[in-house]
Curated annotation (Swiss-Prot):
The encoding gene: serC
Annotated CDD domains: PSAT_like
Annotated binding of L-glutamate, by residue: 41
Keywords, comma-separated and alphabetical: Amino-acid biosynthesis, Aminotransferase, Cytoplasm, Pyridoxal phosphate, Pyridoxine biosynthesis, Serine biosynthesis, Transferase
Family: Belongs to the class-V pyridoxal-phosphate-dependent aminotransferase family. SerC subfamily.
Keyword Membrane appears in the UniProt entry: no
GO biological process: L-serine biosynthetic process; pyridoxine biosynthetic process
Name the record gives this protein: Phosphoserine aminotransferase
Disulfide bond entries: none
Length: 358
């Protein structure tokens, strides 16, 4: 019997995708070989590769103004590649909403970029999204869409004349996005759209001009990968294959509005369970900034019960509920692949646990 996986990433995958990958693992589409065994230069793999890119653009409703790049190194490599490629001679502005923005800021500073933190919620342990106003003339404005550890999420992205950079690693393909002022939108795909080893970057083509005359190693230059259709070097072929299956699965769910609707229902159920617990459970994030993807909470009346909660949840068939080591507590990551019944099972367990130990 499969466990219900609330892990923050790598995370649960739709069973249909796992079964299809299992079916095709040794014999891809009856060809007598695995997709993992063939060259990335073959027509067979290129159909998967380019098909995945087109499906990703289709889900977000993007036209040819955007390039889709498949890169390695995780979202963490983008913390360096973004300032390396996109900084000019001005100021690069960041909104600091958690560990991942702090790391992005640090990488930019290491590169000697003029970095300005224009807003931060660190003083309250990142429990909310701060009000942010970016300068119109900044080289770029940087945010993290969803903060996996703390369970906060931008409900709407800031409006800015500066090119907006969005780390969407933990809410990738979970809702529709207005790309009207987004210059670069990226994430590792291992939470909501595949397995680890692949990052997907949507970059507006005019931004590639910024890399043109810079002395950047080829592998770290966005232009290199755009000009070579993300095939400059051997890509993570199996991760791209899995991403392609995820794109098919998401398209079969309907538009991202439909995906968002399901995610909203799951989150509402879980937050209601917390809010109606008479203070037994307490969420970390301010209600107005609550994430639909990561629900971080404590057993407020007795934090010593939290390890027992995780243990008993595992015995009941639910894994991945231990909070991040930085924040502690409990965290339920309820990404696209989790269904409403699975979240309902967690809520029922939470009520039973409260009944036993309150």
């Amino acid at each position: 019997m499969r466990k219900i996986n609330f892990s923050a990433g790598p995370s649960t995958l739709p069973l249909e995708i796992l079964e299809q990958a299992q079916k095709e693992l040794c014999d891809y589409q009856g060809r007598g070989y695995s997709i993992m065994e063939i060259s990335h230069r073959t027509k067979v793999f290129e159909e998967v590769h380019f098909g995945a890119q087109e499906k990703a653009k289709k889900l977000y409703g993007l036209n040819d103004d955007y390039e889709v790049l498949f890169l390695q190194g995780g979202a963490s490599l983008q913390f360096a590649m973004i300032p390396m490629n996109l900084s000019l001679n001005g100021v690069c502005e960041y909104a600091n909403t958690g560990v991942w923005t702090k790391k992005a800021i640090k990488e930019a500073q290491i590169l000697g970029v003029n970095v300005k933190t224009v807003a931060s919620s660190e003083e309250s342990n990142f429990n909310h999204i701060p009000r942010v106003e970016f300068s119109d003339n900044a080289d770029y404005a940087y945010i993290c869409s969803n903060n996996t550890i703390y369970g906060t999420q931008y409900q709407n992205y800031p409006k800015t004349k500066a090119p907006l950079i969005v780390d969407a690693s933990s809410d990738f393909f979970s809702r529709k996005v207005d790309f009207s002022n987004i210059a670069l939108f990226y994430g590792g795909v291992q939470k909501n759209a595949g397995i680890s080893g692949l990052s997907c970057i949507f970059i507006r083509k005019d931004m590639l001009e910024r890399s043109k005359n810079k002395q950047i190693p080829s592998m770290l230059n966005y232009l290199t990968h755009a000009e070579n259709q993300s095939l400059f070097n051997t890509p993570p072929t199996f991760a791209i294959y899995m991403f392609n299956l995820e794109m098919d699965w998401l398209l079969n769910q309907g538009e991202l509005d439909k995906v968002h609707e399901k995610n909203s229902q799951k989150a509402a159920m879980l937050y209601e369970c917390i809010d109606l617990s008479n203070g037994f459970y307490k969420g970390h994030a301010d209600k107005k900034d609550r994430s639909l993807m990561n629900v971080s909470f404590n057993i407020a009346k007795n934090k010593d019960l939290e390890p027992l909660f995780v243990k008993e949840a595992e015995e009941a068939g639910m894994i991945g509920l231990k909070g991040h080591r930085i924040l502690g507590g409990i965290r339920a990551s309820i990404y696209n692949a989790l269904n409403l019944d699975q979240v309902k099972t967690l809520c029922e367990f939470m009520k039973e646990f409260q009944g036993k130990y309150a």
